[in-house]
Amino acid sequence: MDLKSAIRTIPDYPEPGIQFRDVTTLIGDARAFRVAIDRMVQPWAGAKIDKVAGTEARGFILGGAVAHQLSVGFVPVRKRGKLPWRTLREDYELEYGQDTIEIHVDAIAEGDRVLLVDDLIATGGTAEASIKLLQRAGATVVGATFIIDLPELGGAERIEAMGVPVSSLVAYEGT
């Protein structure tokens, strides 16, 4: 199945010149969603994975499904202030400012082997911050998987430079 055909492109969103890749159409299509999850799991099926971590918000949907397929637990990587208990946090730079992500202090056990899941990798800033946070919590991040890669923005290369293998299902040239 051609997964690109299940992803809606919205021109000039959220600002002029940006081509927004909307995976909500993919996850709303039962067949495309199933194919995407199966393909996200496949490269990691033989790896020993203890947990899947997914970044807010679409990474929750995808990561939960991947964790289910792998029969492992799920760790939500949330925006600051959204988790109700004690947290570890990681600040990271955005194009215009800074943001913070968090996980609960007990979400990861020392030595847990974790797969990071999100819908899209662009510059890699959020993925890098997530990996640093998971590593600080004691995890070994065994890989990162995405539906979409925007290779011109260099995110996958940035994550691979951290020693974390990356897989993605489709690539779009340009932004």
Swiss-Prot record:
Keyword Glycosyltransferase: yes
Main localization category: cytoplasm
Glycosyltransferase keyword on record: yes
Location(s) in or outside the cell: Cytoplasm
Name of the top EC class for this enzyme: transferase
Example of a GO cellular component annotation carried by this entry: cytoplasm
One of the protein's GO biological processes: AMP salvage
Catalytically driven reaction(s): AMP + diphosphate = 5-phospho-alpha-D-ribose 1-diphosphate + adenine
Domain of life: Bacteria
Enzyme Commission number(s) from the entry: 2.4.2.7
Keyword line: Cytoplasm, Glycosyltransferase, Purine salvage, Transferase
Any one GO molecular function term: AMP binding
Pathway the protein acts in: Purine metabolism; AMP biosynthesis via salvage pathway; AMP from adenine: step 1/1
Family: Belongs to the purine/pyrimidine phosphoribosyltransferase family.
Assembly, per entry: Homodimer.
Function according to Swiss-Prot or TrEMBL: Catalyzes a salvage reaction resulting in the formation of AMP, that is energically less costly than de novo synthesis.
Protein name: Adenine phosphoribosyltransferase
